[in-house]
Amino acid sequence: MRHRKSGRQLNRNSSHRKAMFSNMASSLVRHEVIKTTLPKAKELRRVVEPLITLAKTDSVANRRLAFARTRDNEVVAKLFNELGPRFAARQGGYTRILKCGFRAGDKAPMAYIELVDRPEAAVEAAAE
């Protein structure tokens, strides 16, 4: 029985799921908006939001925890230098999920997941 088991399986084994969400979290931090399927976006939110909360307090231990989850120094630097200070006053809710129709090949529901309070230049670049 799967009573009280949280998280979606997404037809992947645990190592594949962990790697996928690590890569997706890195992409979201780097680009601040990505397009993916709706269930993946909803699960990604559970990975990215704690990372940003971690980045609000800059310490060596927190940087190491963030690196352990993303395996990317560039992403860790952006988390702690840009996103942590940007979201310092916000108590959670750092991401927004926008539904954007269905994929042509298999009718999978698609969504954009983005960081809220993005700078205007990033918003205009993403729109193009």
Curated annotation (Swiss-Prot):
Disulfide bonds: none annotated. One of its GO terms (biological process) is translation. The keyword Coiled coil does not apply. Keywords: Ribonucleoprotein, Ribosomal protein. One of its GO terms (cellular component) is cytosolic large ribosomal subunit. PROSITE patterns: RIBOSOMAL_L17. SUPFAM superfamilies: Prokaryotic ribosomal protein L17 (SSF64263). InterPro entries: Ribosomal_bL17, Ribosomal_bL17_CS, Ribosomal_bL17_sf. GO terms for molecular function: structural constituent of ribosome. Part of the 50S ribosomal subunit. Contacts protein L32. Belongs to the bacterial ribosomal protein bL17 family. This is Large ribosomal subunit protein bL17.
